[in-house]
């Protein structure tokens, strides 16, 4: 419902009688008479979204707690209400990556992505919350049940929408109210209403169902006493799953794999390097159910994936079978941080982290022809890459297609794909097919990739849940003279760095000893703080203390010096 930020009007307080009526209605709809508003003041405003209009109710701190669509009586709680009252709604568990990669990107929860057993209250049409198995009491999405979930004992092989998502954490509703509350990830061994049991901790079977790979595995059972430990660390089944996925990736996507290859080389240089972005101290062959590399490889030889030679632990992989259904249906994933991305961050961190400043990373996402090039070198076409990643991909493509000029290794003879990518915006029919290697990357990035940026705090945590489209924005500071010879300094475009306008205005009142006002910037269509007097440098110093480096701040002084007579 809130894929984009809705337009909202000014908030107004509800009358006491309306407040009581609203509470009674919601208690009746949720069959929860214990629920109550945490503040005595409740506000309301109308919203106008992309596909719906309605009313939002907030507490006295302007935190949205309920909303409903126009001409409909159904009230939906927000995730913030569920954080205050964990037992407010029945909860459907799913996997963390399903929430991050799918639900937060606008998808509904499929039955194959959910974790049974289900709450008996989760009948068709029931309002429910969605939580991850790592934090089973922290609701991250709200939705309506579309299937009779209690009737499902297993979800492997099942299809259909389990829950239609209405609202989720950090969606347009959260953004329009500028919410900064973070989920209270409390890991507990048992839910307050005993509706979330230890059996809901996922098995490797259910993860594979999300990936649509149907394999016969043993379900992992976990005692109640072990749940806290399981929630803090990967289970053996989880480790088995990740190592198995790395094997599938190696057999289907790893161009560097050359057979025959020794077992130790196969594990260290291929399996471990083809893991998703997880801690290798937590996920390795020693922590699997096989314990040893030899047992792991012999298991998959028995399953028909590999062909081995040797005895005992001295094994050599001499063949592979890519006709297995699991490999045919395998969907590649983003590998752990690439060397170039890590180096980019480390080089930036070394310069900026020491001073406690934020730092940024420029990323690129392919479209059209770029996807074709990445497929040729077996890279995913739906993820983000650094410029160094793309440079390496282009070099690999040139090598695979034998495009290097035999007379001059510093030049490339472009094939049709590379030629179209480089000359996409040039309407030159007879352009040369020969180009210097160093001249390929810039037009290729400009023509075929969308630029994104991600900002990291000084402690290396992400400022945004996902990279933001476009180039890194700059804060604008202007000192000028208004009519009446009144000098002011304006600051704008700071909200992207999670600087609150009201907090900034309050700080500048103290620092600059002058009055401040908050208005809307005509240039950036965002909040603008104005303070009396020429305080450009003082504002820059304050922003530096907030972790924003000076190179991200543009200061313009429009005050003209008086000419001497």
UniProtKB/Swiss-Prot annotation:
Say which domain of life the source belongs to: Eukaryota
Q: Which InterPro entries match?
A: EIF2D, eIF2D_SUI1, Pre-PUA, PUA-like_sf, PUA_eIF2d-like, SUI1, SUI1_dom_sf, SWIB_MDM2_dom_sf
Set out the biological process GO terms recorded for this chain's protein: formation of translation preinitiation complex; rRNA processing
Please name one Pfam family that this protein belongs to: WH_eIF2D
**What residue stretches are annotated with the PUA domain?**
89-170
Q: Which intervals hold domain SUI1?
A: 475-547
Residue ranges constituting the SWIB/MDM2 domain according to the UniProt record: 362-447
Q: Which GO terms describe its molecular function?
A: RNA binding; translation initiation factor activity
Which pairs of positions does the record mark as disulfide bonds?
none
The entry's other comment says: Present with 3870 molecules/cell in log phase SD medium.
Q: In which family does this protein belong, per the annotation?
A: Belongs to the eIF2D family.
Q: How does it assemble?
A: Interacts with the 40S ribosomal subunit.
Please quote what the entry notes about the protein's domains. Answer: The PUA and the SUI1 domains may be involved in RNA binding.
Q: What is this protein called?
A: Translation machinery-associated protein 64
| The organism of origin for this protein | Saccharomyces cerevisiae (strain ATCC 204508 / S288c) (Baker's yeast)
């Amino acid at each position: 419902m809130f894929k984009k930020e809705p337009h909202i009007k000014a908030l107004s307080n509800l009358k006491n009688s309306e407040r009581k009526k609203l509470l009674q209605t919601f208690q009746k709809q949720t069959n929860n008479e214990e629920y109550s508003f945490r503040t005595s003041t409740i506000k309301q405003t109308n919203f106008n979204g992309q596909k719906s209009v309605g009313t939002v109710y907030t507490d006295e701190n302007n935190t949205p707690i309920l909303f409903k669509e126009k001409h409909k009586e159904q009230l939906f709680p927000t995730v913030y209400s569920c954080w205050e009252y964990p037992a407010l709604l029945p909860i459907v568990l799913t996997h963390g990556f399903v929430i991050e990669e799918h639900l937060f990107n606008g998808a509904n929860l499929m039955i194959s992505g959910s974790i049974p057993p289900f709450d008996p209250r989760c009948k068709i049409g029931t309002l429910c919350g969605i939580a991850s198995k790592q934090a089973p009491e922290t609701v991250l999405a709200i939705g309506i049940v579309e299937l009779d979930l209690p009737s499902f004992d297993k979800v492997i092989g099942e299809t259909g929408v389990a829950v239609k998502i209405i609202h989720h954490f950090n969606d347009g509703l959260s953004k329009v109210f500028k919410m900064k509350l973070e989920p209270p990830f409390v890991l507990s061994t048992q839910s307050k209403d005993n509706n979330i049991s230890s059996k809901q901790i996922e098995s490797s079977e259910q993860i594979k169902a999300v990936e649509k790979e149907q394999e016969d595995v043993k379900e992992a059972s976990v005692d109640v006493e072990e749940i806290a430990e399981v929630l803090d660390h990967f289970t053996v089944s989880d480790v088995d799953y990740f190592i198995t996925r790395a094997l599938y990736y190696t057999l289907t996507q790893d161009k560097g794999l050359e057979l025959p290859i020794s077992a130790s080389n196969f594990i260290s240089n291929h399996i471990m390097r083809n893991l998703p972005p997880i801690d290798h101290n937590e996920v390795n062959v020693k922590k699997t159910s096989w314990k040893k590399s030899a047992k792991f490889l012999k298991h998959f030889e028995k399953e028909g994936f590999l062909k081995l030679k040797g005895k005992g632990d001295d094994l050599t992989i001499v063949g592979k079978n890519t006709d297995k259904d699991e490999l045919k249906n395998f969907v590649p994933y983003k590998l752990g941080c690439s060397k170039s991305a890590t180096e980019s961050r480390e080089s930036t961190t070394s310069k900026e982290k020491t001073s406690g400043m934020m730092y940024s990373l420029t990323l690129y996402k392919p479209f059209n022809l770029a996807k074709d090039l990445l497929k040729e070198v077996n890279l995913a076409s739906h993820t983000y890459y650094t410029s160094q990643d793309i440079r390496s991909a282009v070099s690999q493509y040139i090598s695979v297609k034998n495009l290097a000029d035999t007379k001059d290794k510093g030049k490339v003879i472009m094939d049709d794909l590379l030629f179209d990518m480089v000359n996409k915006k040039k309407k030159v029919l007879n352009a040369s097919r020969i180009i210097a290697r160093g001249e390929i990357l810039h037009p290729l990035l400009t023509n075929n990739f969308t630029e994104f940026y991600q900002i990291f705090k000084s402690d290396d945590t992400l400022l945004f849940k996902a990279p933001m489209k476009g180039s890194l924005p700059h804060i604008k500071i202007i000192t000028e003279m208004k009519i009446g010879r009144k000098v002011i300094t304006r600051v704008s475009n700071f909200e992207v760095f999670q600087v609150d306008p009201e907090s900034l205005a309050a700080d500048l009142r103290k620092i600059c000893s002058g009055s401040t006002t908050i208005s809307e910037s005509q240039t950036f269509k965002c909040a603008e703080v104005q303070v009396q007097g020429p305080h450009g440098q003082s504002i820059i110093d304050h922003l530096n203390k907030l972790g924003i480096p000076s190179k991200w701040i543009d200061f313009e002084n429009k005050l003209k010096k008086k000419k001497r007579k």
